[in-house]
Amino acid sequence: MATFKKFNKDKRPKRNTQSLLFKRKRFCRFTVAGVEEIDYKDVDTLRDFIAENGKIIPARLTGTRAIYQRQLNTAIKRARFLALVPYSDQHKI
């Protein structure tokens, strides 16, 4: 017959309460700036939305609205194709 162990709350890892309380509110930079379309030639803006390993950062982390996230993905892919932005961290420009 199986014996059940009692669950001890004290052994759980404690979360940092300060990080839970002070989460920064995410907002869409493009909505605030009043941008209508994201341009693939604006490399400085595109680099803010590309991770160190070359991946496109998802909207749930950046706070970008869905419309702008789709435009951002297209712009980054076009800039990669034209060699304005590297595909990965291994390709330095």
UniProtKB/Swiss-Prot annotation:
Q: Does the keyword Ribonucleoprotein apply?
A: yes
GO molecular function terms listed in the Swiss-Prot or TrEMBL record: small ribosomal subunit rRNA binding; structural constituent of ribosome
InterPro entries membership? Ribosomal_bS18, Ribosomal_bS18_sf
Stretch forming the signal peptide: none
GO terms for biological process?
translation
Query: Which keywords annotate this record?
Result: Ribonucleoprotein, Ribosomal protein, RNA-binding, rRNA-binding
What is one GO cellular-component annotation here? cytosolic small ribosomal subunit
Q: Which SUPFAM superfamilies match?
A: Ribosomal protein S18
PANTHER family reported in the protein's UniProt record: 30S RIBOSOMAL PROTEIN S18 (PTHR13479), SMALL RIBOSOMAL SUBUNIT PROTEIN BS18M (PTHR13479:SF40)
Q: How does it assemble?
A: Part of the 30S ribosomal subunit. Forms a tight heterodimer with protein bS6.
Identify its protein family.
Answer: Belongs to the bacterial ribosomal protein bS18 family.
What does the record give as the function of this protein?
Answer: Binds as a heterodimer with protein bS6 to the central domain of the 16S rRNA, where it helps stabilize the platform of the 30S subunit.
**Name recorded for this polypeptide:** Small ribosomal subunit protein bS18
- The gene name reads rpsR
